[in-house]
Each structure stands twice: as C-alpha cells, then as structure tokens.
Amino acid sequence: MSVKRIKNLVKQLNEYRHAYYNQDAPLVSDAEYDRLFDELKELEEQTGFILSNSPTQTVGYYPVSELAKVTHPIPLLSLEKTKLISELLDFMKGQEVLFMLKLDGLTTKLIYEDGRLIQASTRGDGEVGEDITHNIPAFLNVPLTIPHKERLVITGESFIPTNDFERLKDTLRDGNGKPYKNGRNFASGSVRSLDPKNCIGRCVRFLPFNVLEGMEDVPFPDSRACKLEGLTHLGFGYCPFFSCLLYTSPSPRDS
C-alpha cells in the first residue's frame, strides 16, 4: 500500500511541478504541494523505496522551453525545509547563519567578466538552467557593467514587487491564456519570455542572496554577509538579512 501511494504521489507531484516550472500555471497552492511532498519524503524514509523521478531527488523540473540551456558548474541547490524550531536550532549551532526575507520569484544567476555582464540564467533543475541574458536590459535594477574587473558570479531572486503585480495582473495572461495567480508566476513568465518586449514594463527586479565566485578582496572573504555588503559598492542591492551565531542549542517546545 505504501509503495502504491509513493508511486501516486510521485506522479501527482511531477504533474504539479511541470505546470509550475514550465507552464507558469500552478495547479495547487504552495502549502498543498509542501504537504504532499512531506508525505512522500516520509514514506520514502519509512520504506526505503525511492523512484528515480521522485521530486525528492531533484531541485526543480528540467526546463523544456526554447531558451538555450545553460549548465551550472556549481549546482544551484534549493534549501532544506523544516517546520520544527528544534531542527533549526540544531542546524544553527556553532555556525553563523543568515536570516533573509523570502522573495517570491525566480532564482537567477548573473556572471560578470572584465566588468561586464556576460550571461544571466535561471536555476532550472539546479544543474541545467535557461539563458535569459536577452531579458536583463528590461530589468529595473541589474547593472550591465560594474567597477570590478575580476570574474564575479552571483545568485539572487528575480521578482516583481507585490504592489506592481497587483497593478499589472489584470492586464496580462499566462501561457494558458489565464490571469497570473501570483507574483512568482508573473515574474517567471516575464523573465523566461522569448521576446524581451514582453518583459519591458513589468517592473522586474533582481536582488542578490549569494556570491558564488569572486569578491575575495573583502575584509572577510569567507563571510557571505561581508560579500553581500560588498556588492553595494558595485551598484547592487541585496536581499535584506541579519546574521546570528548560536553556540549552544536550547530545547524549546516546537509549535
């Protein structure tokens, strides 16, 4: 019975993932998807039965649009999830942790060489994404040139602010001809458009949340916080955050 349930969940979740990642038309809420995903993960741990196409084994659905594919030498992995305070505290113990706002958009990677933007791409499945360089000029806040000659690779979120989404959502349609349900899918449809004209005027913004390569000249090059703050000198903003270092882990009651 558990194996049959696993197969059904894998089929169901992959259908949801396809609609979300490749059609910009979600079929269920994030909360419902997370509930089914957590059920699948628990059943897999209980039974030891994991299908090769299980969504627990991949970051995202493989892109199937006409955009050129981009391989990520450093995989763009997603974060682990937890609903338990105790698990979060155990993870934090003995290391600096950055707490960031979760932006509702599309993970994007920018590559700069000799002070110029040479490529922008989506995360895709974490290992292979899509080239969206042609749409970057339509973004509101991405520098095309920066005062930094060394190679720089940063990741962040491409998104549309809520007030702009509310203002624009009734005037545009998704790939299925329906109104966009949320800002994330509106941003994804805009960023992954084949024609840059479709991205212009949609108020797409980018905020970095990590430096994958470069910024080794900052005072503390091993500190993500220090590198993010260093980006401000190059004309970037960054996703708001605060850092915390926990040496001992208390035992709070999970709620």
Protein language model regions, located:
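A short acidic, often aromatic-flanked loop/helix-cap motif at beta-alpha or helix-coil junctions
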Residues: L84-E87, D164-F165, G214-E216, L245-L246
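Short secondary-structure capping/junction motifs at helix and strand boundaries
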Residues: E96-M100, P179-Y180, Y238-F241
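Hydrophobic pocket-lining residues within nucleotide cofactor-binding pockets
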Residues: L103, V211, P252
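Covalent nucleotidyltransferase
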Residues: I111-Y112, R116-C239
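Acidic carboxylate-rich catalytic motifs and surrounding loops in phosphoryl-/glycosyl-chemistry enzymes
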Residues: E157, C239-L246
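Single conserved hydrophobic/aromatic residue that forms the stacking wall/gate
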Residues: Y247-S255
